[in-house]
Amino acid sequence: MAIILGIDPGSRITGYGVIRQVGRQLTYLGSGCIRTKVDDLPSRLKLIYAGVTEIITQFQPDYFAIEQVFMAKNADSALKLGQARGVAIVAAVNRELPVFEYAARQVKQTVVGIGSAEKSQVQHMVRTLLKLPANPQADAADALAIAITHCHVSQNAMQMSESRLNLARGRLR
C-alpha cells in the first residue's frame, strides 16, 4: 500500500490530489487547490509552501509526484512556475518524501491515452479511474492525474525489475 500526493504547481493556483494504491487498485483520498490571493510573489510562495506542508501533514503520503516545468509563453511565467514548483518540492524534501517528476505530455498519455489531451478529457478520465461522482476542478484533476501516473510508472518499473531478476535466475526464457 502507498499513498501518493500529486501536485500541479502554479503561482496563483496549485492543485493537489491524494490517492492510495493497493496493488492495481487506486482509491481517492482527497484533492483541492491552494489559492494564493495576494499579489506579491514571495507571499504567494509562502502560502504554497504552507499549504503543501499542511497537506503532507494531513495525508502522510509515501511519495510526492509533481509536474515538470514546461516552456511557458513568456519567461516571467516560466520563472514564477519554477519558483512555485521549488517551494512545493522543498516542502516534500523537508518531510523526507521521495520526489518524482513527470512531464505534462506523459501524464496525459498515461491517463487519457493521448499526450495532447484537453483538460476536460483529463478530468473525465480521472473521474472514471477513481470512480468519483463528478469531475474534479481542473487543477485538482491534473494533480490527481500526476499521482495516477506515478502509480502506473512505479508499478511498471517494479514489474520490469521482477522480470529482470527472474531472467537472471533463469526463470524466464
From Swiss-Prot:
Cofactor(s) annotated in UniProt: Mg(2+)
Reaction catalyzed: Endonucleolytic cleavage at a junction such as a reciprocal single-stranded crossover between two homologous DNA duplexes (Holliday junction)
UniProt-listed GO biological process terms: DNA recombination; DNA repair
Gene Ontology cellular-component annotations: cytoplasm; Holliday junction resolvase complex
Alphabetical list of SUPFAM superfamilies matching this protein: Ribonuclease H-like (SSF53098)
NAD recorded as keyword: no
Co-factor binding details: Binds 2 Mg(2+) ion per subunit.
Pfam families in the cross-refs: RuvC
Family: Belongs to the RuvC family.
HAMAP family per record: RuvC (MF_00034)
This protein's name: Crossover junction endodeoxyribonuclease RuvC
